[in-house]
Curated annotation (Swiss-Prot):
PROSITE patterns: RIBOSOMAL_S10
Cross-referenced HAMAP family: Ribosomal_uS10
GO molecular function, one term: structural constituent of ribosome
Subunit structure of this chain's protein: Part of the 30S ribosomal subunit.
Gene behind this protein: rpsJ
Protein name: Small ribosomal subunit protein uS10
Gene Ontology cellular component terms for the protein in this record: ribonucleoprotein complex; ribosome
Biological processes per GO annotation: translation
Length: 102
């Protein structure tokens, strides 16, 4: 597997949880002898929702909510078989979405 690279893309609503998970992945990859590029912070997506406060009549009274999706990108260059096995066994937090491309 010397000419391949693994691209890992992580998404989460909580940036602290995301950074902890990224740290675990980077430590695991470096321990097994692979080169790591990243973590690269990708743009944060902000979804804003505007909701009427009351059930009827008052259109001018509104409440605004937003949800932020934080993203990180990690490239693992020259992964070994040990790296792949260690990443498969890694247990990350429930609030982090992980996409892996070979």
């Amino acid at each position: 597997m010397p000419s391949q690279k693994i691209r890992i893309r992580l998404k989460a609503y909580d940036h602290k949880l995301l950074d902890v998970s990224v740290g675990e992945i980077v430590d695991t990859a470096k321990r097994t002898g692979a080169r790591v590029a990243g973590p690269i912070p990708l743009p944060t997506v902000v979804n804003k929702y505007c909701v009427l406060r009351g059930p009827h009549v008052d259109k001018k009274s509104r409440e605004q909510f937003e949800i932020r999706t934080h993203k990180r990108l990690i490239d693992i260059l020259e992964p070994t078989q040990q790296t792949v096995d260690a990443l498969m066994k890694l247990d990350l937090s429930a609030g982090v979405d992980v996409e892996i491309k070979l």
